[in-house]
Amino acid sequence: MKKFLAIVLLVSLALTVCSCAKVYKTETVKIDKGSALMIAHRGLSGMEVENTESAFIAAGERSYYGIEADVRRTADGDFVIVHDDNLRRISGKNILVEESTMEELLAAELIGKDGQPERLTTLLNYINICKQYDKQAILELKSEFTREEIGLIVGLITAMGYIDRVTFISFDYDNLTYVREILPTQSAMYLFKKLDKNITEKLIRDKIDVAISYKALTEEALKEFKAAGLKVNCWTVDDVKVAERLAAMGVDFITTNILE
């Protein structure tokens, strides 16, 4: 019976690992992007493990305008680069990000590429890579940060001499409000999935740029945003025809996992 249970557990573990496995491409897919600038989503995540130094370096070595990454708070008041609030999807382990210390998070082994382990990285390391490769840092504020925490993030990047090359993005409008209270002219984009008159009016009023799901953007809305002086970023586009159509429409940025 014990032997049978052990076999069941091993099979379950193998199935879990297989279900989490991701197929990575060996090179980017080139497109006719016109004047649109390309942003590598969570680094070059179509080729490397998302939000890792490997993904950021891979993007840095190519023609991308910007490298996007997600930042969350840790239990000990630090800032880690990771998308999900739980590491289960990327590590196979139930680890809550904001209830873990930076040391614990950096020790977690991620599901790697070609059987090679990967690990998370810090906000400072991400900014350093953007700086090394002269890329715009597109930093998504994932947590619902306090104004004090936003101040700490801004202070850390300012001390590194790279704040002028950072665009803050977030689904949480308060995060961007705090950024603008501290740095009134800082580049900022609001992330949203559907067109909404109230959102449009708010963005135009606050002069916060647009980061919209490509599925929601219409030519009429694009014209309205551009007429108001707002820049438009579409996410997350991995289809060549869709990307080239958006570029022809005149979007400013295309966020992608693999297109270049």
Residue ranges of each PLM-predicted region?
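Phosphate-group recognition and catalysis centered on beta-loop-alpha active-site segments
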Residues: 5-9, 19-260
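Residues within alpha-helical transmembrane segments of multi-pass membrane proteins, especially transporters
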Residues: 14-18
